[in-house]
């Protein structure tokens, strides 16, 4: 599924430069120094206010519709619960870009142990991918979710050629995970599996997620889609939190 471009990324303006004018010889330079200090203090104060607002954004989201849609207690989550940076990814297992981007979050987690947790939400936007989503949700009952997800993403080109999932090829793609396939097939239509799938889709609609992958980092979406935009969003969240 093709990505849709969002609003342009905004940039933070630097503080105003200090204007220094030459003084006649012998003039008291205290006013110049005081003026420079005042400008510096104003710049520091503005920076502090900005980042205070960023730090409080996640807690403020808790009482909003967007915060409710991003609540991921039911979702598979990787990382420490105490981590201050929370990445929520809306993912379609048949999405080629999802497979390409998934290692980015894992890389950041490896490089920042204990600081990041990742929650995955499923949306079946591609033809035939709902079966893959059900397999993923059912694999959680055997504590094999992350292994199943990585196996599906790694073999995606075989079971989802041209972004169209082939359900009959999916079971073969996860043969090496160690799942009890009979139990898996019995679980794919379980009520709790269906409920989680419906919740993810409803939350995606509430958040206006129309393409995958879509990321929210501490409640913030990417201003536009791209690898650098995602990295910037994660880097900023890490800098704010730690």
Segments from the language model and where they lie:
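Conserved strand-loop elements at the edges of beta-sheets that form or border functional pockets
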Residues: 80, 89, 224
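Ser/Thr/Pro/Gly-rich low-complexity linker/stalk segments immediately outside membranes or between
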Residues: 52-66
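C-terminal cap of thioredoxin/glutaredoxin-like
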Residues: 1-47, 172-242
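A short beta-strand-turn-helix
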Residues: 67-85, 110
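Structural alpha/beta surface segment adjacent to cysteine/selenocysteine redox centers
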Residues: 83-94, 99-175, 205-210, 235-242
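A generic local structural motif
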Residues: 72-76, 104-106, 201-203
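Generic structural signal for secondary-structure transition and capping sites
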Residues: 54-55, 144, 157, 179, ...
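Short secondary-structure boundary/capping elements
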Residues: 68-70, 100, 196
């Amino acid at each position: 599924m093709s990505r849709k471009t969002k609003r342009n990324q905004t940039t933070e303006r630097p503080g105003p430069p200090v204007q220094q004018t030459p003084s006649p010889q012998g003039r008291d330079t205290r006013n110049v120094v005081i003026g420079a200090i005042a400008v510096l203090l104003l710049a520091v104060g503005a920076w502090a206010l900005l980042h205070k607002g960023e730090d409080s954004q996640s807690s403020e989201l808790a009482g909003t519709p967007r915060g409710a849609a991003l609540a991921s207690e039911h979702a598979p989550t990787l990382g420490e619960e105490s981590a201050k940076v929370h990445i929520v990814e809306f993912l379609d297992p048949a999405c080629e870009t999802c497979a390409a981007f998934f290692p980015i979050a894992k890389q950041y987690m490896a490089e920042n142990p204990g600081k990041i947790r990742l929650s995955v939400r499923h949306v079946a936007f591609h033809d035939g991918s709902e079966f893959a989503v059900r397999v993923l949700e059912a694999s959680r009952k055997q504590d094999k979710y992350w292994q199943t997800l990585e196996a599906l993403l790694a073999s995606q080109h075989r079971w989802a050629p041209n972004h169209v999932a082939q359900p009959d090829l999916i079971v073969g793609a996860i043969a090496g995970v160690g799942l009890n396939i009979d139990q898996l097939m019995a679980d794919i239509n379980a009520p709790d599996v269906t409920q989680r799938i419906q919740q993810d889709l409803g939350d995606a609609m509430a958040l206006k997620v129309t393409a995958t992958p879509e990321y929210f980092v501490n409640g913030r979406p990417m201003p536009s889609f791209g690898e650098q935009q995602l990295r910037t969003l994660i880097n900023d969240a890490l800098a704010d939190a730690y």
